[in-house]
Amino acid sequence: MCNNGASMRLRTFLLHCSLAALLLWAAFLCAQPQASPPSAKTAAKTDDALELVKQGQKLNSEGKQDEALALYDRALQLSPNLFQADLAAGMALDLQGKYQQARQHLAKAIEEAPPASKVQALRTMAVSYAFEHNADEAAKYERQAFDAQYNAKQYADAAGTADELARIYLESGDSDNAFQWYQSGHLTALHQPNLSSAEKDLWEFRWESALARIRVRQLGRSAEAPKHLAAAKAILDKGDNPDQVRFYPYLSGYVAFYLHDYKTAIAELQKGDQKDPFVLSLLAQACEKSGDHAQALDYYRKVLTINTHNPTNAFARPLAKEKIAAVSK
């Protein structure tokens, strides 16, 4: 009986201690400030950061890169792993010619990008190298993008990526690799199931367009370029790709320029897209070759009003900056 009584008293004591501990813990929790769920706070910061990126992109399109970069920096302070902010910062820095700084942001964007945006980030890095005509470095990123698209059976997208790399090679002076990648793009496009005759003609036009530009740049093969130009025109004349007709003056002007027929080049390129920096750059160069330096400078200045981050501007903008800087000295 004594043992039972002692045991009962011990259990009662322990129960009272446990109850007291629970009451103290509850009082402690009640005294703590009620915090918002971390996910809600993070989402709010991300939304604010994305709005800053949007505002920065508008400023960048207006040529206000410094102001845009200030907003991207604020966005990254709010959301340090926001790939859109790093991507946009890299683009703005490329337009300023600050390529090493740009690639630090773009490398971070590639790491941060979700799977659906990885290809975009990779291709943006490739364009960064196109600004310096560094096709081999650009290829490291374009190939990753191409492989991802090809493996996902996104053949039209993969063909576009291959053609983009081919153009970077061509405008960097490597016509052999340009041929290989244009050919890869053409063959990849034909993997698409159930292509219509118009779609087949589209890819044939692009292939003939590529061959015309490649041959006119190759030593000893420039005489072949007009044949491919005529083949491209014949495809357009079938009329099943009317939206491609607007590209023909650029193609014709390009071939004429590299055949040293600057009068024809100017006449054709003036019919082309006057908002395309590469067309404007070719016009400027053709005017220079013709001795019209004032008109050339006018075209170079127009190039610098365009703030897109794509291969055409990557080829045109650095040259325009160089030419304008030379006359400003």
Q: What is each model feature region?
A:
Residues 46, 80, 114-116, 150, ...:
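Short coil turns that delineate tetratricopeptide repeat
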Residues 47-74, 78, 255:
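Alpha-helical segment of the N-proximal tetratricopeptide repeat
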Residues 50, 84, 118-120, 160, ...:
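Start-of-helix register in tetratricopeptide repeats
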Residues 57, 91, 127, 167, ...:
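Residue-level recognition of tetratricopeptide repeat
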Residues 61-62, 95-96, 131, 164, ...:
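Register position in tetratricopeptide repeats
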Residues 74-77, 110-111, 147, 187, ...:
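Conserved structural position within tetratricopeptide repeats
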